[in-house]
From Swiss-Prot:
InterPro entries: 3PPDioc_HcaF (IPR054881), HcaF (IPR023712), NTF2-like_dom_sf (IPR032710), Rng_hydr_dOase-bsu (IPR000391). The lineage of its organism: Bacteria, Pseudomonadati, Pseudomonadota, Gammaproteobacteria, Enterobacterales. Pathway: Aromatic compound metabolism; 3-phenylpropanoate degradation. This is 3-phenylpropionate/cinnamic acid dioxygenase subunit beta. It comes from the Bacteria. NCBIfam families: 3PPDioc_HcaF, PRK10069.1. It catalyses: 3-phenylpropanoate + NADH + O2 + H(+) = 3-(cis-5,6-dihydroxycyclohexa-1,3-dien-1-yl)propanoate + NAD(+); (E)-cinnamate + NADH + O2 + H(+) = (2E)-3-(cis-5,6-dihydroxycyclohexa-1,3-dien-1-yl)prop-2-enoate + NAD(+). This dioxygenase system consists of four proteins: the two subunits of the hydroxylase component (HcaE and HcaF), a ferredoxin (HcaC) and a ferredoxin reductase (HcaD). The keyword NAD applies. Transmembrane segments: none annotated. Its EC number is 1.14.12.19. It comes from Photorhabdus laumondii subsp. laumondii (strain DSM 15139 / CIP 105565 / TT01) (Photorhabdus luminescens subsp. laumondii). GO terms for molecular function: 3-phenylpropionate dioxygenase activity. Disulfide bonds: none annotated.
């Protein structure tokens, strides 16, 4: 999914923007409450869930449209996320003992139409605060490009694609065991 260009003609109505925004706020509340099984229900079977870091490029290279290679931190599907969650539920995932306390913040949502009916792109900025033990605190900052589609069974929404790009070029945290 390419980075979205804000196109006034492709923007959704305020009512639809509100509906999709509320769905995404509900989704991050599930993650903060460690309700991972409920969260999985919001993901489509054909989900693509990726995270990469930003790569610093020299100005002269950007002018020539030379893109440095991307560093992928994960490239998961729904089955792989189910496995990650099953591991977290065992109590044996050392990186999450004791479990992290998280707060997901989502802002600047731009929602636009796609070529498919009932499917929309959502570009947003996020901040994920993670606290664990007494002194371990981490901030993950970046942008998300989501694709959501209407679930014909429930008339709600499903996330069918999520691309997460961290703003950090160098990762200084111990692990990536939390969900974005």
């Amino acid at each position: 999914m390419k980075e979205l260009i804000v196109n006034q003609e492709k923007r959704v109505s305020p009512e639809l923007h509100y509906e999709i925004s509320q769905f995404l706020y509900y989704e991050i509340a599930l993650l903060d409450e460690w309700r991972f099984r409920d969260w999985l229900e919001l993901l489509s079977e054909d989900l693509s869930y990726t995270m990469r870091t930003i790569v610093n490029a020299q100005t002269r290279d950007r002018r020539k449209s030379i893109q440095p290679p991307t560093t992928w931190l994960f490239n998961d599907n729904k089955f792989q996320l189910e496995r990650r969650i099953a591991r977290l539920e065992t109590g044996m995932a050392w990186a999450e003992e004791p479990p992290s306390r998280t707060r997901h913040l989502l802002t600047n949502l731009v929602i636009t139409e796609t070529d498919l009916p009932d499917q929309f792109h959502v570009q947003s900025n996020y901040l994920l605060y993670r606290s664990q033990k007494e002194r371990d605190e981490v901030f993950y900052v970046g942008k998300r490009l989501d694709c959501v589609r209407r679930n014909p069974k429930t008339d709600s929404w499903l996330i069918c694609k999520r691309e997460i790009t961290l703003d950090q070029a160098v990762l200084t945290f111990h692990n990536l065991s939390v969900l974005f």
